[in-house]
Amino acid sequence: MVGFSSCRVGFSPPTNNREIFWWAKAHPTLSTHHSMRTSFYFRSNHYDDFMQKDSRTYT
């Protein structure tokens, strides 16, 4: 579970089970460089879409 500490770079793990599975696979190591690169890639390519879907669901 320590791999989920990427919130240090301003990124929160998604709550959807399928998204969590992908996100966990994308963060297999505790390498700071790897985690930050992966988090940035995920955030810039998917995070906005995820947040938009999330806000439509809960508003």
From Swiss-Prot:
Protein name, UniProt field: Uncharacterized protein HI_1564.1
Organism: Haemophilus influenzae (strain ATCC 51907 / DSM 11121 / KW20 / Rd)
